[in-house]
Amino acid sequence: GSVIGCGETCLRGRCYTPGCTCDHGICKKN
């Protein structure tokens, strides 16, 4: 749920930062 350490825009649901998941177009961690 946090964008700290993530926050990248995720295209096609893919995040390149380890441990981050795509949530409504933004990569988030927990």
Swiss-Prot record:
Record flagged with keyword Kinase: no
InterPro entries: Cyclotide, Cyclotide_sf
Disulfide bridge map: 6-20, 10-22, 15-27
Top-rank lineage group of the source organism: Eukaryota
Cyclopeptide (Gly-Asn) crosslink residues: 1-30
PROSITE patterns, sorted: CYCLOTIDE (PS51052)
Keyword Disulfide bond: yes
GO terms classed as biological process: defense response to bacterium
Tissue: Expressed in root nodules but not in seed.
Annotated keywords: Antibiotic, Antimicrobial, Disulfide bond, Knottin, Plant defense
Annotated domain remarks: The presence of a 'disulfide through disulfide knot' structurally defines this protein as a knottin.
Function field: Probably participates in a plant defense mechanism. Active against Gram-negative bacterium E.coli ATCC 700926 (MIC=2.4 uM) under low-salt conditions. Not active against Gram-positive bacterium S.aureus ATCC 12600 up to a concentration of 100 uM under low-salt conditions.
Similarity remark: Belongs to the cyclotide family.
Protein name, UniProt field: Cliotide T16
